[in-house]
Amino acid sequence: ENNNNKSNLEFFDAYILLITNSLKKNNFEKAEKFLNQSLKFQNQNRFNLVIFESLRQYIYTFKNKKILSNKKNFGNISIINQAFQRCYLKKDSARSSFLNLINNPDGDYSRYVFFYINYLIQNKKIEEAREVVGQLEYINSTLLLTQSKSWIENNEFKKFNKIFSCNNHNDIVSEFLFLISNLYSSQDNFEKSNFYLNLSNYLNPKFILNLSLVAENFYLNQDYEKVKKVLKNFDKENEFYYWFRIKKETQIIINENGYEEGIDYISSKFRKIDNPNLKMVFDIANFYKNSKNYKKAIEYYTKIIASLSEDSEIKSDLLYRRGGSYERLGNYKKADEDLLLSLKIKPDEAYVLNYLAYSWLERDYQVDEAIEMLEKAYALRNDDPYI
């Protein structure tokens, strides 16, 4: 029975290949035919039903220039599919679909901020796109969004439609396959993840930034030579993906030759960057902290904190990181100042409460208050093994 299931899964994958190839050639009839033939294999895997039904809806939309009314609901994946279908059909409701998605409290849908910005630029709503990225912080945004923010701040609007367009059905299906690849990656099924990632790249090779997931998959599999090969796709033209490349190369050096050599490598690359972005400063501070070079980490954290506005959301986290570095050096006065200020900004941060409480207990200082903080931290995150 296991062999039968394996064969059925392979048959389904083979049909997905045929469907993808038909879509690439703009042959919707053939894609639909192969999809119908795959029907008997879609129940063999929990993702296959989602893939089958989503592709059925997309092909119907591309072929008939309207949205299928009789369709199954897969929760947030259906919301994502609906947003792209409306965008493809140039419906005004695409805007509300993207907004519903990125404001959804049931998960992290920040990737779709990129597609909302792309939609705004495609519809000549440049000022609205500027407003969206104005709300993003470089330090705590995803790789794709930091690059997007940089493009808009440098007026490089054409770069968005160069890599993705809602008018192109292949770009849309490519993004859906990328989503499936991400789902498999989150299950540590890197072989399946790379299968869908390769299909995604086949349909839209312009979206070279998606190869960062390929690099991550190979890295998690400790296939470092393949990681290095993929990373060569990222050059200085897209500075945040180039920085991602440097960081990943550094991690490989650390794993193979130790922290000292890794820190030397990233430091030499960092020094060559003119006017490095705060995100890059933040990353190198974290590398120094992880390598126990706390003085250097403090120097960089201080530089970032000094540049932030008083109401910056990320200040609390930076004070926590700098405070932890002071604590490791035995400078308890400054450590306590930073950690208490971090809690003043965000009183319910369980990790900060936990860290400060244990620091005080180890010093036999403010014991009653420390125990109260521990109890509060546990109440906030009682399912967290680190609390």
Where are these regions (language model features)?
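Catalytic core segments in nucleotide and nucleic-acid processing enzymes
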Residues: K296, Y300, L343
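Alpha-helical solenoid repeat scaffolds
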Residues: E1-E261, N275-Y294, I314-R328, A350, ...
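Amphipathic alpha-helices of TPR/Sel1-like and other helical repeat/solenoid scaffolds
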Residues: N3, K192-S200, I266, L339, ...
